[in-house]
Amino acid sequence: MTSQDFINECRYRITYKHNDKVDTLKGEDNFIETENVHCVWFNKSLQNYKGLFIILPLDGKYYECTYNGDKKELYIDTYNKESNECIELKEED
């Protein structure tokens, strides 16, 4: 698997995951395309990959994809942003 293959696979899987949860019975129609999924951070170490993804327009979540090259497994974790707090730190002399 190349780096671009990993990113493309993650974008596809996140799109499917998002669209699978859209409730058309409730009148929701916020389906997305893979073009709406953006990689904001990526790393490759040996045969393993990790990437952070968001959906634009923002859905309030970010997705962490991890590929285990030894087991040929892809894991997707979904996170919700709960808060964003500013903490002022005092500088020491």
Give the role of each language-model region.
Residues 1-23:
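N-terminal trafficking/processing presequences and adjacent post-cleavage segments
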Residues 22-38:
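Intrinsically disordered, low-complexity regulatory segments in eukaryotic proteins
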Residues 71-93:
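A short, surface-exposed interaction/processing loop segment used at functional sites
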